[in-house]
A protein has these predicted regions:
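General small-molecule cofactor/ligand-binding pocket signal
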Residues: 2
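Short active-site-adjacent structural elements
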Residues: 47, 76-79
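A short, terminal or domain-edge coil/loop segment
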Residues: 49-64, 91-98, 119-123
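Rossmann-fold NAD(P)-binding glycine/threonine-rich loop
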Residues: 71
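Structured adenosyl-cofactor binding patch, chiefly the S-adenosyl-L-methionine
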Residues: 78-122
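S-adenosyl-L-methionine/SAH cofactor-binding core of RNA-modifying enzymes
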Residues: 5-64
């Protein structure tokens, strides 16, 4: 899990400035061998089993790391979004990025229990 501190918001900092600063910090932590997936409200939605299956396929593609990026309060700039082809959405609803961290970690755990036939996920 890569954690990047969000840019402090002030009256003089415009949204594009905040997005750029957060994205610069993110890029510093990425490696060329990473598979990057943005968590974005306009991304592809999965149910839990579908997400588990997608995760399994990604894990078998030979990437050193799967990196899921959660944007800050203002999301990602269009330029940043366009650098990556994979965008997943957890919901059509809007949540704080802190809540998405929690929800996404639970879904990662759930996906692994589904793939390992663990009873955590009841179908």
């Amino acid at each position: 899990i890569i954690f990047v501190l969000q840019q402090k918001n002030s009256k003089k900092n415009k949204v594009d400035f905040i997005q750029t600063k957060e994205e610069e910090r993110l890029v510093e932590k990425l490696r060329p061998t990473d598979k990057i997936i943005l968590l974005d409200e306009k991304g592809i939605q999965f149910d839990s089993v579908g997400f588990a299956n997608k995760l399994e396929k990604l894990e078998h593609q030979g990437f050193k790391r799967l990196v899921f990026i959660i944007g800050g309060p203002y999301g990602f700039s269009t330029v940043f979004k366009n650098q990556f082809t994979d965008h997943f959405a957890l919901s059509k609803m809007t949540f704080s990025h802190q809540m998405i961290r929690l929800f996404f970690c639970e879904q990662l755990y759930r996906a692994h229990t589904i793939l390992n036939n663990h009873p955590y996920h009841n179908t």
